[in-house]
């Protein structure tokens, strides 16, 4: 691991965050071979907000007007990327209120809600409803983990007002949920 001077590290840190505003302090610390505290001090010195604030900023600037099928504040998780009728990505941080108290495992309806609301959000119509969902929970998710849900819209096979959206949710690189959502939507006039 190459050691950088403070000035070089801060310049590279700024570039890394500009390229990926969703990178964590822990990932940055590993990338630059320094402590998380050093990264936090560098961020403060550069006036770069913490991850949660960066995510909120990106989502509010880019996606508040893009989502038509439901208000942005009704989306479970935070949308970090969306291309209507194509794909979308959201993140959801599992906190104490989302888990069973006795074993700290996330309640399944939170994972489902994130995936379902993402499947709804990617539909470009004002009315989008789930008509059928097939969901498989691959592994349990624990308190403190971050779920990244990725939705992909399948190409339409006919003129029906049904669109199929596949959603896969991950913790890191590990698949935790896989779902197929059939979405009814009012056709655009």
Curated annotation (Swiss-Prot):
GO terms for biological process: fatty acid biosynthetic process; negative regulation of DNA-templated transcription; negative regulation of fatty acid biosynthetic process. GO terms for molecular function: DNA binding; DNA-binding transcription factor activity. InterPro entries: HotDog_dom_sf (IPR029069), Transcription_factor_FapR (IPR017275), WH-like_DNA-bd_sf (IPR036388). Gene3D superfamilies: Hotdog Thioesterase (3.10.129.10), Winged helix-like DNA-binding domain superfamily/Winged helix DNA-binding domain (1.10.10.10). Transcriptional factor involved in regulation of membrane lipid biosynthesis by repressing genes involved in fatty acid and phospholipid metabolism. Belongs to the FapR family. This is Transcription factor FapR.
